[in-house]
Amino acid sequence: MYQDKILVRQLGLQPYEAISQAMHNFTDMRDENSHDEIWLVEHYPVFTQGQAGKAEHILMPGDIPVVQSDRGGQVTYHGPGQQVMYVLLNLKRRKLGVRDLVTLLEQTVVNTLAEMGIEAHPRADAPGVYVGEKKICSLGLRIRRGCSFHGLALNVNMDLSPFLRINPCGYAGMEMAKITQWKEDATTDNIAPRLLANILALLNNPPYEYIAT
């Protein structure tokens, strides 16, 4: 894999649409010499509808806005207490295929949860990471000009009830889970560094630098 410095941005709690636009701008403007970046963020409550999304999977959004997204997949929910990690990687330069990246992201979460004694696994029929039959992490990516954006959303200590207003990722009755069901002291503040360390390990430990925002 190509070795270079990865820039890491810890963005805190942000509106989904502003971060989505920033990802598009970054991807459109980057060139072959641009550093890859990883963005760690939480979002204000929002349902995002992926490219494959069908309106009937949004059951009763109520007061939570619904935003169209160009990531892969169907509808999901983002809210405070969910750690989102966006991966802005030059896949061509890192010699990664799209399937490779999906597997890498799933393994990042599996390894992170294993450190806390939580046994999790991906599913071939439904992308994401699961504990038993319950989904704890959602994935959605977009590739443009050989570069990835969007990423994963790991449920840490969030309110899961808004997921009842949708068919998560297009699956009616899909049960959702969060880390605090097994590890009560988990927060996004202590999960984000673990996620970052695990994805960097799977990328062969490139140097990285936190960028102030």
Swiss-Prot record:
InterPro entries: aa-tRNA-synth_II/BPL/LPL, BPL_LPL_catalytic, Octanoyltransferase, Octanoyltransferase_CS
Positions annotated as active site in the UniProt record: 169 (acyl-thioester intermediate)
Binding site for substrate: 71-78, 138-140, 151-153
Pathway annotation from the record: Protein modification; protein lipoylation via endogenous pathway; protein N(6)-(lipoyl)lysine from octanoyl-[acyl-carrier-protein]: step 1/2
Enzyme class of the recorded protein, top EC level: transferase
PROSITE patterns per UniProt: BPL_LPL_CATALYTIC, LIPB
Keyword Acyltransferase found: yes
EC number: 2.3.1.181
CC annotations in GO: cytoplasm
Primary location group: cytoplasm
Pfam families: LplA-B_cat (PF21948)
Site positions per UniProt: Lowers pKa of active site Cys: 135
Domain BPL/LPL catalytic: start-end pairs: 32-207
Keyword entries, A-Z: Acyltransferase, Cytoplasm, Transferase
Subcellular location: Cytoplasm
Keyword set includes Acyltransferase: yes
Molecular functions (GO terms): lipoyl(octanoyl) transferase activity
UniProt-listed GO biological process terms: protein modification process
Job description of the protein: Catalyzes the transfer of endogenously produced octanoic acid from octanoyl-acyl-carrier-protein onto the lipoyl domains of lipoate-dependent enzymes. Lipoyl-ACP can also act as a substrate although octanoyl-ACP is likely to be the physiological substrate.
Other information: In the reaction, the free carboxyl group of octanoic acid is attached via an amide linkage to the epsilon-amino group of a specific lysine residue of lipoyl domains of lipoate-dependent enzymes.
Protein family per UniProt: Belongs to the LipB family.
Name used for this protein in its record: Octanoyltransferase
Lineage of the species this protein comes from: Bacteria, Pseudomonadati, Pseudomonadota, Gammaproteobacteria, Enterobacterales
